[in-house]
């Protein structure tokens, strides 16, 4: 039985969601006694991390969009049963850096795959599990890509080779999801100063936990 809460963190490349999460968790630990788990997709467990390497390998430029989607779905399933569900059943507060919405935005809006197919695969992999809250960090594609290019410590992966048009479609996909699920997905302006973005995210999380 699930007694914990699931919060997912989403955003286009360069939105800074991972950085926000790194700063958010220590602040949250000062305010709640609940045990907190942070993890990521694809990855989080050994099998899923191996799949992550396959997906991001810069040499795999011939990967078909459906192959890419199925790899993400496989990684999601293993991560869920091995790490996420046990934590939720133990009453923990679980944060996942990317989850089901990423597939709809990237492989759906970005790659042009049929949304209904992606939603079915998501439901198949998760047994219908949905986040209690999704923090969507929004940033224009031009700004996001500029941030990526300015980060010299970031290792280039296959997805960094995509055109700006694909990144723009991904963002539109996310914004459409936010309109479709207004109660679950909150949109946060990620162009604001980091401290302000973290503060807004913290407020939304605390609102969920205190409801």
UniProtKB/Swiss-Prot annotation:
The keyword Nucleotide-binding applies. GO terms for biological process: dTDP biosynthetic process; dTTP biosynthetic process; dUDP biosynthetic process. Its EC number is 2.7.4.9. ATP binds at residues 11-18. GO terms for molecular function: ATP binding; dTMP kinase activity. Keywords: ATP-binding, Kinase, Nucleotide biosynthesis, Nucleotide-binding, Transferase. The keyword Glycoprotein does not apply. One of its GO terms (cellular component) is cytosol. It comes from the Bacteria. It catalyses: dTMP + ATP = dTDP + ADP. It is an enzyme of class 2 (transferase). InterPro entries: P-loop_NTPase, Thymidylate_kin-like_dom, Thymidylate_kinase. Disulfide bonds: none annotated. Belongs to the thymidylate kinase family. Phosphorylation of dTMP to form dTDP in both de novo and salvage pathways of dTTP synthesis. This is Thymidylate kinase. It comes from Streptococcus pyogenes serotype M3 (strain ATCC BAA-595 / MGAS315).
